[in-house]
Amino acid sequence: MTKSAKTPAAVVLGEVDLPEGQLLILDPGLGRFWRHDAEPASPRKKDPAAHDLRIVGPDAEAAGRAYDREFDPRHLFDRTDPQDAVKHFGRFAKEQGFDARAEVLSSRVPHAERARLAVEHGKGLGVVKYNGLWAVVADGLPRDRGLQVIGVPMPRGEFAGRWRSIDVVVDGKAEAVRSEQVSGVMVDHGQLLFAGLGPMGRFRMWESLDGLADYVFFGKDAPALAKELGASDLGKGVFGWKDLPVAQVGEKATPLQERIGKDSLAVGVDYRPHCNLERLNAQLRESEEDAGSLVLDGARAVGCGNRWGDGIFPVSRHFDAKGRTVRLRVELGTEERQQLLRRIQLRQRAAIVTRAILDDGEPIRFAERMKPHSAQDSGWAFSSGVEDDTYMKKASNLVVVSLRSLLARCKELDAILDAPVGSVFRREGEGFVPE
């Protein structure tokens, strides 16, 4: 089939090897929280101790599903209030008529085991909790060959340059006739990593693999500061020191940070130990596709930017007519995600407000959305009703401000801001109604 000019071709981001036939999808920037087969404690020392609970009894699974706290209804993971959790579940089960109870486990369930439990419960696709975060795991995939990871672009237009989805292709020629979906993979650093479940046990974040690290800085005041401190120009506006022994990083970092703080310099810093995450990020910084690869325990893994930022993204599994898995898909540019981004972008734009509101403290009583004059203009104009025609004709009585600043003063506006051009509202009680 000939592709439409409005449908850019898919982009191959790399290949992932799955020696056990199990795929794990998570945000690599959260990789230090994945403890694999180790004690699943948080790496942050300030975090309280957590416990895992198992739901038992004749109605255990039905009660767990109704309680709806975990993808795997047989457990409650990462609870810092275990006895309270036992009591809360007990009350729920009693009220709902379930013969089930929660027990605190004497030892915690490692993340790799949780992943296996998740795919068991989800019959091949599941959500696994790790230190309160979510990853997605899939089972029953080919072990004897690499699988392509591809970026499927959005059509040209409003969201051009973003991915509609990122797919792991099992059979690129087969036709998918049905799908199932879980929600989802939690992203906090705008990235995704596709790795074999077993190989993920070798992923290291903030732990240098060779005992070395880079310490870099950037920003408006960085060039002058680099000359002062004898730092190298590393290109693309970045300065600093490469391949420092980890133990010696402080010798460079301390005077640099003291200097930045003393004079409030416009400089950002980044500590980059030679770990798996930094090896991936170094590739992403140079990649036109914002993608890179790692080798973990001899198996290839693929990392990439998701081009939509942070959030929880659904993952779907697609089957052919014979019930075989033909691809897995991280759903990125969904209609819901597009609407969310439009809302965020709109609230970063400007609006017109009268000085009666801005300076004199009058409340917003009237709102009208006109056709925007630029990409930075929301089209919204707000008045209090005390202004007459003469007042409104005087340009100095009108001020351009950000919608965000108005929302801080009048939270009720948020409910009407997505209304189309031509909408007019007036205040009534604690909210706004169409005029």
Predicted ranges, named:
Residues 1-5, 224-435:
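Acidic, proline/glycine-rich low-complexity IDRs
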